[in-house]
Structure formats: structure tokens, C-alpha cells
């Protein structure tokens, strides 16, 4: 069974409050998502493997640690997941970025795949899949399935806010994928929105309706 990590750091919780606030404008919303993603990024990369190398400082030769092997790959679920990429790239500037394009049918709430573009070495990378909202879980499950079909083996799912229904579906369908979130909310309403949630993350990031 996949594990769920909820980040309760005071800075993250403070910023999530203003992400939720309907009076937060597009510019500030975008900045807050970026900031929270960076803060979460420190923790989600905590288990990255290290290897020791020899370097020379201005004073002496010494042994020091660097990240071992291939570095992280980032895979935002379009379009809202794009809002989380820069915050992670700030920490991992060498990361390669793939994209999975999905949209949710407004009637069935089922995800429809329209675009997948990935680095050629996804099987060798730890991939962090980003999407601000884990609501029904359908989009996350579809994205993870698409990545595994293309060779991905080491996957993590990073969201800002999740509903219990979405967490359960991901755990049922992809028990090997750990889930990292800033908050777990109460439930989904009849329209598939997380309650209390933050509304439509994509619309709030890009100023659309």
C-alpha cells in the first residue's frame, strides 16, 4: 500500500490558507503555489540516494556527497500541474521535464488523455508527478498508468490538496506510488470538487473560467 505524507510545516499551512481564499488574485495564487511546492520539494527529495566523490576546496582535498546516478524527472499533469514545476526546478535545476495532458469529461468525470511527452530515460529516473488537486483520483491514476506503460518505475505523486476518495483510488490502482500532499480535505461534492478545497486550480493559476 502506498504511503500518504501530509506536510504540516507552519509555513506550508499558512500559505495554503491563502491559496484556498477565494479573494486571492491570480498573481498571488500563482506565487503561493510556487512557494508551497518549493517547501514541499525539500521533503519529497529527502530520500534521494547519495554517493561520495573527491573534491578540492581552496584549503584541502576532501570527500563530499552528491546525488547518485540519474536525477529527478518532473511530470506535470496539464495544465494545472505546470504551476508546480518552477518551484521544484528551483531546487533541482538539472531535472528533465515531461508532460501528460489530460482533461476531465464534465459529465462522466473520467480523464481523457490527449498528450504524453517524456524524456527517453524515464525508466532510470525518479519521477515526481505534479497536480495541485487530487480529487476523484481519476486523472492521477490515468497519468501514472500512462507513465508506467512508457517504462517509468520509480514514481511519486505530489499534490497540494487531496480528497479521501482520490487518495483511496490511487492507493488501490497504484499501491507502489507514495502520495505527498499539503492537506487532506473532507470530501468531494456532486460536481467532483474537493470540499472545502480551493476551487479550480487551473482557472485560478491562469485567470480563466
Swiss-Prot record:
Coiled coil: none annotated. This is Uracil phosphoribosyltransferase. Its EC number is 2.4.2.9. The gene is upp. It catalyses: UMP + diphosphate = 5-phospho-alpha-D-ribose 1-diphosphate + uracil. Pathway: Pyrimidine metabolism; UMP biosynthesis via salvage pathway; UMP from uracil: step 1/1. 5-phospho-alpha-D-ribose 1-diphosphate binds at residues 79, 104, 131-139, 200. PANTHER family: ADENINE PHOSPHORIBOSYLTRANSFERASE, URACIL PHOSPHORIBOSYLTRANSFERASE, CHLOROPLASTIC. It comes from the Bacteria. GO terms for molecular function: GTP binding; magnesium ion binding; uracil phosphoribosyltransferase activity. Pfam families: UPRTase. Its cofactor is Mg(2+). It comes from Brevibacillus brevis (strain 47 / JCM 6285 / NBRC 100599).
Amino acid at each position: 500500500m502506498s504511503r500518504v505524507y501530509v506536510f504540516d510545516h507552519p509555513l506550508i499551512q499558512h500559505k495554503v490558507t491563502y491559496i484556498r481564499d477565494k479573494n486571492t488574485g491570480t498573481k498571488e495564487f500563482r506565487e503561493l503555489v510556487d512557494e508551497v511546492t518549493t517547501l514541499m520539494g525539500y521533503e519529497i527529495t529527502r530520500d534521494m540516494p547519495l554517493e561520495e566523490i573527491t573534491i578540492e576546496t581552496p584549503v584541502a582535498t576532501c570527500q563530499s556527497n552528491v546525488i547518485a546516478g540519474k536525477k529527478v524527472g518532473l511530470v506535470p499533469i496539464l495544465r494545472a500541474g505546470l504551476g508546480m514545476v518552477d518551484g521544484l526546478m528551483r531546487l533541482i535545476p538539472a531535472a528533465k521535464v515531461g508532460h501528460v495532458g489530460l482533461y476531465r469529461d464534465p459529465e462522466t468525470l473520467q480523464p481523457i488523455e490527449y498528450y504524453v511527452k517524456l524524456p527517453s530515460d524515464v525508466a532510470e529516473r525518479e519521477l515526481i508527478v505534479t497536480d495541485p488537486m487530487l480529487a476523484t483520483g481519476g486523472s492521477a491514476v490515468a497519468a501514472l498508468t500512462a507513465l508506467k506503460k512508457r517504462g517509468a518505475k520509480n514514481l511519486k505523486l505530489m499534490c497540494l490538496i487531496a480528497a479521501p476518495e482520490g487518495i483511496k483510488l490511487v492507493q488501490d490502482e497504484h499501491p507502489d506510488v507514495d502520495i505527498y500532499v499539503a492537506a487532506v480535505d473532507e470530501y468531494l461534492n456532486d460536481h467532483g470538487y474537493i470540499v472545502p478545497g480551493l476551487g479550480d486550480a487551473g482557472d485560478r493559476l491562469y485567470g480563466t473560467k
